[in-house]
Curated annotation (Swiss-Prot):
It comes from Colletotrichum gloeosporioides. Residues 399-422 are annotated as: Disordered. Mg(2+) 2 binds at residues 108, 112. GO terms for molecular function: geranylgeranyl diphosphate synthase activity; lyase activity; metal ion binding. Its cofactor is Mg(2+). Substrate binds at residues 108, 112, 198-201, 246-250, 336-337. This is Dolasta-1(15),8-diene synthase. The gene is CgDS. It catalyses: isopentenyl diphosphate + (2E,6E)-farnesyl diphosphate = (2E,6E,10E)-geranylgeranyl diphosphate + diphosphate; (2E,6E,10E)-geranylgeranyl diphosphate = (5R,12R,14S)-dolasta-1(15),8-diene + diphosphate; (2E,6E,10E)-geranylgeranyl diphosphate = delta-araneosene + diphosphate. Its EC number is 4.2.3.214, 4.2.3.215, 2.5.1.29. In the N-terminal section; belongs to the terpene synthase family. In the C-terminal section; belongs to the FPP/GGPP synthase family.
């Protein structure tokens, strides 16, 4: 254990702007094992207020009352963990990150009762899918949507502060909530395998992104990679110290469960590796924590001599060390892990060491008083005498090298397929499910194949967001979700047939596998079933579906005619087409939800849905032609007219030229010939490059960017107006995030 005469060192070297020293009495004692002096933000009150705000939002949104002894980030002794992790943070960004951290603690509490990988995923999965991939029907509960609303709020506020660093925070945050149950419940035979998962699960990769964001620092990928030998050690020390301090609480929780459960801790890894009891394992872990910090200091000294870093890198290293020191102090005195510590109270906002933060406190050795010993004593002295049983069983899997951030595309496809394997997964909607026909197998085959392909889940996320306003009864909303999902996939099947598209979502299109006739028949059958489902919801829902279904077909008719005749529409005609086709499904969802709404029934989202549909498609147009991969230029291969292409063709016509039009006519002839040959009808790389060059010269790409930015502003204005119309509580963070993600 550390000596009271330890030679403490300041973090850095660096200049301090927003932090002050922590009172020395909190760390100059035998309980604090680190060499680094902790500092705390002068704006600790900002962090505390953000955390209380997150608690209130959680209770109001979920209807769940937090337990009286439930503790997150706030600590009236050592200070708020975010003020200790990020003492040099910009106040506005400290507020954002503190809210996010409190959300993580509340989410972590929800996973505490999980005793199987499946139960873990039930709680953990929806947050990850909201930030990334296609959702599941079980994701859309009030509790999950409440957590997603809080995530969306943090994401929007971070992106508005700094889009680049905000995106980095969101990306790394997704890594935390993407850890799967099989990873959380696996047996680890070595500390390396354990740490490999914990660097995701415990948020190590998220912490460094938050440091950059909070302190407004930009490092290149090369600079971050060069620092990995240091950052890996620093974050390993933080994770192991967490395991050391949290062991009593987590072990006690585990022992209370008759059925066992997850108890991911380095203490238990050491117990299994070396056959130690919990006391010896904890002492061994503490020695490892000290050794790792020593190794960090040695490596840092060598790094500073061999590769003298630029000032901004030196500053970043200092921020990491402050994070290490703050993490060490906070765990010692937090009620979350120490039952002798006081509970946070709202009247204690901004307090440190039980009183207001004193910026004049100097680092002077002070011995602990007897009253402090219940809080600042080595955790090993508070261990219970109860022994533990192993936490794994034969059903748990061993560690694999696949990590959440490194999941292969094949693995993603398998997971997507696994969630859409059966008729029941895709079609059954209680209580409005239609009876299974005795001979449905053939007619559903093409549809089930299409629905099993990975998708973005954009429409499900949109309905989650709209339900913030409409509060549709769960059964009705589940039916509407199924209708929209089926209508979307069925329309894609028909589009691929009519456009002769060989690929959909990275796999062969359904008609390539099942033939045109079977695919068309399957899609038509499913659309009929959707009409039946809408009828069961009521006349208003049926009317919504039929009117928007008509618009979808009208929009497709224009697209087919333009492509067949190789005649570009006017830009207003193209916009009208987008509102019919892409906006049609969005409006169908919003109108059906409004028809079944229990609140805000007066709120008409049609204009917003039309704008979102247009924005969604124009961004897709732009990204397809500006992609670095030539193989992505699908619109050119299919002969589809997009805004950049339409703009360039009209400019060419004004100038009396025909080159671009001639290329498109030749491409159309090649596609027609490919229908009776082995040629896939795709444009050559050289032709695609030429078209891209012509679009740039015509100013069509810049024109598209300008249009998208203007449309983005218009969409946000309409969204704000709807929020005002919805009245108190009408702020829709999820819709703001959906809109922001369409920005270019």
């Amino acid at each position: 254990m550390a000596s009271t005469m330890m030679n403490y060192q300041d973090c850095g070297p660096m200049r301090y702007k927003s932090s002050v020293p922590v009172p020395a009495s909190l760390y100059e004692n035998t309980a604090y094992p680190s060499k680094f002096r902790p500092r705390i933000s002068k704006h600790v009150d900002v962090a505390d207020k953000a955390c209380w705000e997150a608690c209130d939002d959680f209770e109001n949104a979920t209807g769940l009352k937090l337990k009286a002894d439930s503790v997150g980030c706030i600590n009236p002794i050592g200070g708020n963990v975010n003020a200790l992790w990020f003492p040099e943070a910009i106040p506005e960004r400290l507020h954002i990150i503190s809210y996010l951290s409190e959300l993580l603690f509340r989410h972590d509490d929800l996973t505490d009762d999980a005793v199987t990988p499946e139960q873990f995923d039930e709680v953990h999965g929806p947050l990850a899918r909201f930030l990334g991939s296609e959702s599941k029907q079980s994701d859309h509960t009030t509790k999950h949507n409440a957590m997603n609303t809080m995530q969306a709020r943090v994401a929007i506020e971070a992106l508005e502060q700094n889009e680049q660093l905000g995106k980095l925070v969101i990306e790394k945050w997704k890594g935390i909530v993407s850890v799967r149950g099989q990873d959380a419940f696996m047996e680890h035979k070595t500390l390396d395998s354990y740490m490999h998962v914990r660097h995701y699960d415990a948020g190590a990769y998220s912490v460094w992104s938050q440091i950059l964001f909070c302190c407004d620092i930009s490092l290149t990928d090369e600079e971050l990679t060069g620092l990995e030998p240091l950052t890996w050690l620093a974050f390993t020390q933080m994770i192991l110290w967490h395991d050391y301090c949290s062991w009593d609480k987590e072990a006690a929780t585990y022992l209370e469960r008759e059925e066992g459960g997850s108890n991911m801790s380095a203490v238990q890894v050491y117990m299994a590796m070396y056959g130690l009891d919990q006391y010896a394992a904890k002492e061994f872990l503490l020695s490892e924590i000290t050794r790792i910090e020593d190794e960090y200091c040695e490596r840092k000294a060598s790094y500073m001599i061999e590769f003298p870093p630029a000032p901004h890198i030196t500053h970043y290293i200092g921020l990491i060390e402050m994070c290490m020191a703050g993490n060490t102090l906070w765990h010692l005195s937090s009620r979350r892990y120490n039952p002798a510590a006081p509970l946070p109270r709202r009247e204690d906002i901004g307090k440190v060491n039980g009183g207001p933060l004193d910026a004049s406190e100097v680092s002077k050795p002070v011995e602990c008083s007897e009253s402090d010993l219940g809080i600042l004593t080595p955790v090993s002295s508070r261990l219970s005498t109860k022994r533990l049983r192993p936490f794994w069983n034969n059903q748990r899997t061993e560690y694999t090298t696949m990590t959440p951030a490194e999941t292969s595309s094949d693995d993603k496809k398998k997971k997507a397929k696994a969630s859409h394997e059966t008729r029941e997964d895709l079609l059954t909607v209680s209580p409005c499910a239609w009876p299974a026909e005795p001979d449905e197998k053939d007619i559903l085959a093409a549809y089930l194949y299409t629905a099993a392909r990975p998708a973005s889940g954009a429409r499900d996320k949109l309905m989650d967001a709209l339900d913030k306003w409409y509060r549709v009864p769960p059964d009705a909303l589940a039916t509407i979700r199924t209708i929209i999902r089926i209508m979307h996939n069925a329309s894609l099947m028909l589009d691929d047939v009519q456009d002769n598209s060989p690929v959909r979502r990275g796999s062969p299109s359904a008609h390539v596998i099942f033939g045109t006739a079977q695919t068309t028949n399957s899609a038509s059958y499913l659309m009929i079933k959707c009409v039946d489902l809408a009828r069961r919801l009521g006349d208003d829902s049926l009317s919504c579906l039929l009117s928007e279904l008509s618009q979808l077909h009208l929009g497709q008719s224009h697209d087919l005619a333009w492509t067949f005749h190789c005649k570009a529409p006017s830009i207003p005609e193209y916009y009208s087409h987008l509102e019919q086709k892409t906006g049609g499904l969005f409006r169908m969802a919003s109108r059906m939800m409004r028809a079944s709404a229990t609140q805000n029934k007066h709120l008409d989202a049609c204009k917003l849905m039309s704008l979102l549909g247009r924005l969604y498609q124009l961004r897709d147009d732009y990204q397809d032609i500006t992609s670095e991969s030539l193989s992505t230029y699908d619109d050119l291969d299919e002969g589809s007219f997009t805004l950049p292409l339409i703009h360039a063709l009209h400019r060419e016509e004004e100038q009396g030229e025909v080159q671009l039009h001639s290329i498109l006519q030749s491409a159309r002839a090649a596609r027609s010939a490919s229908a009776s040959s082995n040629n896939d009808g795709k444009l050559s790389v050289e032709t695609k490059l030429l078209i891209r060059e012509m679009l740039e010269e015509a100013g069509s790409l810049e024109h598209t960017r300008v249009v998208i930015r203007g449309l983005y502003d218009e969409t946000r204005a309409v969204l704000t107006a709807m929020e005002n119309e919805a009245g108190s509580g009408g702020k829709n963070w999820m819709l703001h995030l959906i809109t922001f993600q369409l920005k270019v």
